[in-house]
A protein has these predicted regions:
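N-terminal targeting signals for export/organelle localization
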Residues: 1-44, 157-163, 180
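A short beta-strand-turn-helix
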Residues: 39-60, 83
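Short active-site neighborhood of thiol/selenol oxidoreductases, capturing the structured segment around
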Residues: 51-72, 78
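Structural beta-sheet core signal
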Residues: 62, 93-95, 136
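Structural microenvironment flanking redox-active thiols in thiol-disulfide oxidoreductases
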Residues: 72-111, 177-180
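Thiol/disulfide oxidoreductase modules built on the thioredoxin-like
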Residues: 110-111, 120-162
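Short, low-complexity, Pro/Ser/Thr/Gly-rich segments in the mature regions of secreted, periplasmic
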Residues: 167-180
Length: 180
C-alpha cells in the first residue's frame, strides 16, 4: 500500500512538472516574436534637428554608423549617388549618424562623401534599427521607400532610379480643376 501511494505521488509530481515546464517552454520557444520596429514606406518621420523635410522635394537619408563595415563597403555606391546628385538628382542626400561630430567628419572625409551630415542623431527616432539604411522621404516627412542593409546591385539601381525620377512638383502639370 505504501509503495502504491509513493508511486502515485511520484506520478503526480512528474505530471505537475511536465505541465509547468511545458507552459514555460511554450512561451519561451514557441511564442510569436514581437514585430521589429523597422521603418517602412508610408511611415511619417519626426523632424530632425538641423533638417527641414519641406525644404526639399525628396531627401535620401543615409543611416550610417562609424565602424559599420557594411557602411564602409557601400561607400563607392554612396559616392556614385553624390555624383548623380550633382548631375541632376531630384533628391537631396543627408547622412545621419549616431556618432559624435568629430567621428562623423572623419567618416565623411575618409569615404569622400559629398553629403549633408548630421551627427548625434538617435537612429531610433527614424525607426532605423540597423546600418546602413537608406530612406527616400518626401517633403512632408513621409517615407516613400526604404532599403535596409547592404544593397544588391539591383537595389542600388532602384535607389538611383528613385532619386532621378521626376516628382509631382517637377512635372508642374496643369491642375484640371483650376478655374481659367
Amino acid at each position: 500500500m505504501k509503495v502504491k501511494i509513493e508511486t502515485a505521488a511520484n506520478i503526480i509530481v512528474i505530471l505537475v512538472a511536465v505541465v509547468v515546464g511545458s507552459v514555460f517552454l511554450k512561451d519561451r520557444f514557441f511564442s510569436t516574436p514581437p514585430e521589429p520596429n523597422e521603418v517602412k514606406a508610408g511611415d511619417k518621420l519626426t523632424n530632425l534637428e538641423g533638417w527641414d523635410w519641406s525644404a526639399h522635394d525628396q531627401t535620401l537619408v543615409l543611416g550610417l554608423r562609424k565602424g559599420c563595415h557594411f557602411c564602409e563597403d557601400s561607400a563607392p555606391f554612396y559616392q556614385r549617388l553624390t555624383t548623380q546628385q550633382q548631375g541632376g538628382s531630384n533628391a537631396t542626400i543627408v547622412a545621419v549618424f549616431p556618432d559624435a561630430a568629430d567621428a562623423v567628419k572623419e567618416v565623411v572625409q575618409s569615404e569622400g562623401l559629398r553629403v549633408h551630415a548630421l551627427a548625434g542623431v538617435p537612429l531610433e527616432r527614424l525607426k532605423i534599427s540597423g546600418t546602413p539604411t537608406l530612406l527616400l522621404v518626401n517633403r512632408s516627412g513621409t517615407v516613400v521607400n526604404a532599403w535596409i542593409g547592404m544593397l544588391s546591385p539591383r537595389q542600388e539601381l532602384e535607389v538611383m532610379k528613385a532619386t532621378t525620377e521626376p516628382t509631382a512638383a517637377d512635372l508642374k502639370l496643369p491642375d484640371p480643376l483650376a478655374k481659367k
